[in-house]
């Protein structure tokens, strides 16, 4: 007979590695864009698990896909393939430029695979001297030692000893800096097509075109980290599809599984040939459970009405933020695209994004931050208008408590 353990927030401090600082409440149930904690308190979710819960909590298509697959087959390893993985890979090639897919378990793993492929391709075709990776300041690409080094935030990568070498960080949206530095030694340029953790910073059209042209000029691969922007988040299935450029390699995760862990690296057949048998791998990557859920997510999110709905919801959010700003004069600007939005605080409110987050939580609203000065919103792509209106009423009360 199993005795149910009493779980309280204090248990976290007793048993967990202290690299997180979670809220005091513990959620126990979610439905749509609402969650409930142990005490029955209800919250509106504008955070979406950091841009993960693209269909909200416990969406029927995801629940059905998972439960159906759970009764069939869970795990094999890549000694064998499986039907959900092959179906999902086919779908991803149909909704993107890609011809080949590598499955992993997270965005960091997908980015690690992308970086290894870029280095491998350059070494095979041009020789070992072509190894430089250019990335951008304030970028974020994951927490493995390689990806956190490529990410342009020293706060995440310092303190762990010698870092992987031949990585250069340049200012985002600075064409002249890239022109001055990129060379035939550069094997790849890695970037987010809209910086997330760095403050919700969109690229200029001129910058994104220049990056592609300079990569072509110097035979460098263009790697798009679409872990946060992908799977419908910007109103396109992948953000690159609205930018007029196509990358050589793309990483995707977060919303791909809608809450079930999965990541993928997408690329061309020509490049994929350089990851031969044994050069890279993953025990869990492409497991049937994750791929069955992700297949259901991709099918749902890629529907034209879902993508159009993202654009409509973006306007609802912008209108709500504009009304709050008229009332409280708190935001300097609203940045982002689709349902990856950042409300940048003005000079009087500098450094208080977390204050807004905490106050919102007390009112029953979950939001995020992107640095000290940006309140970030990454809700479900199918959040209802009623849920949005309720959320903004709570945000109004939260800001009022801080004024």
UniProtKB/Swiss-Prot annotation:
Q: Where in the cell is it found?
A: Cytoplasm
- Cited Pfam families: Aminotran_3
Describe which pathway this protein belongs to, using the record's wording. Answer: Amino-acid biosynthesis; L-arginine biosynthesis; N(2)-acetyl-L-ornithine from L-glutamate: step 4/4
Cite a single GO MF annotation.
identical protein binding
Ligand binding (N(2)-acetyl-L-ornithine): 143, 282
The biological processes this protein is annotated with in GO are: L-arginine biosynthetic process
Q: Which reaction does it catalyse?
A: N(2)-acetyl-L-ornithine + 2-oxoglutarate = N-acetyl-L-glutamate 5-semialdehyde + L-glutamate
Write down the InterPro entries for this protein, in alphabetical order. Answer: Ac/SucOrn_transaminase_bac, AcOrn/SuccOrn_fam, Aminotrans_3, Aminotrans_3_PPA_site, Class-III_PLP-dep_AT, PyrdxlP-dep_Trfase, PyrdxlP-dep_Trfase_major, PyrdxlP-dep_Trfase_small
Q: Which domain of life, per UniProt?
A: Bacteria
Keywords assigned: Amino-acid biosynthesis, Aminotransferase, Arginine biosynthesis, Cytoplasm, Pyridoxal phosphate, Transferase
Identify the residues that bind pyridoxal 5'-phosphate: 107-108, 140, 225-228, 283
Q: N6-(pyridoxal phosphate)lysine (modified residue): where?
A: 254
**Other notes:** May also have succinyldiaminopimelate aminotransferase activity, thus carrying out the corresponding step in lysine biosynthesis.
Quaternary structure and partners: Homodimer.
Q: What is this protein called?
A: Acetylornithine aminotransferase
**Organism of origin:** Vibrio vulnificus (strain YJ016)
Q: What is the lineage of its organism?
A: Bacteria, Pseudomonadati, Pseudomonadota, Gammaproteobacteria, Vibrionales
């Amino acid at each position: 007979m199993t005795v149910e353990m009493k779980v309280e927030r204090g248990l976290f401090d007793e048993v967990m590695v202290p690299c997180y600082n979670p809220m005091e409440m513990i959620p126990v149930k979610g439905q749509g864009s609402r969650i409930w904690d142990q005490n029955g308190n209800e919250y509106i979710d504008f955070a979406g698990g950091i841009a993960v819960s693209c269909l909200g909590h416990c969406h029927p298509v995801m629940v059905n896909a998972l439960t159906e697959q759970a009764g069939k087959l869970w795990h094999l390893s890549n000694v064998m393939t499986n039907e959900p993985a092959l179906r999902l890979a086919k779908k991803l090639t149909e909704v993107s430029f890609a011809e080949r897919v590598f499955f992993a378990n997270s965005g960091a793993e997908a980015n690690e695979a992308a970086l290894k492929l870029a280095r491998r391709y350059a070494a095979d075709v041009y020789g070992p001297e072509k190894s430089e990776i250019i990335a951008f300041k304030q970028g974020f690409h994951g927490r493995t030692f390689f990806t956190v080094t490529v990410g342009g935030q020293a706060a995440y990568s310092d303190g762990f000893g010698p870092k992987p070498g031949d990585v250069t960080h340049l200012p985002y949206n600075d064409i002249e800096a890239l022109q001055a530095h990129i060379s035939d030694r550069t094997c790849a340029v890695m970037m987010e097509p809209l910086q997330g953790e760095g403050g919700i910073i969109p690229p200029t059209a001129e910058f994104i075109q220049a990056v592609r042209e300079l990569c072509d000029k110097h035979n460098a691969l263009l790697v798009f980290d679409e872990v946060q922007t992908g799977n419908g988040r910007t109103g396109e299935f992948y953000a690159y599809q609205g930018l007029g450029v196509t990358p050589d390699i793309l990483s995707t995760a977060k919303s791909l599984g809608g809450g079930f862990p999965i990541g993928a690296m997408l690329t061309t057949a020509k490049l994929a040939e350089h990851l031969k048998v044994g050069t890279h791998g993953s025990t869990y990557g492409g497991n049937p459970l994750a791929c069955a859920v992700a297949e259901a997510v991709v099918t749902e999110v890629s529907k034209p009405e879902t993508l159009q709905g993202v654009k409509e919801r973006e306007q609802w959010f912008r209108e709500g933020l504009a009304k709050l700003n008229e009332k409280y004069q708190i935001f300097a600007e609203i940045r982002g695209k689709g349902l990856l939005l950042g409300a940048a605080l003005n000079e009087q409110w500098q450094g208080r994004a977390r204050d807004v987050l905490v106050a919102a939580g007390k009112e029953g609203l979950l939001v995020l931050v992107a640095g000290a000065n940006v309140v970030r919103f990454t809700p479900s792509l199918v959040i209802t208008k009623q849920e949005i209106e309720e959320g903004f009423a709570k945000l109004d009360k939260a800001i009022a408590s801080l004024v």
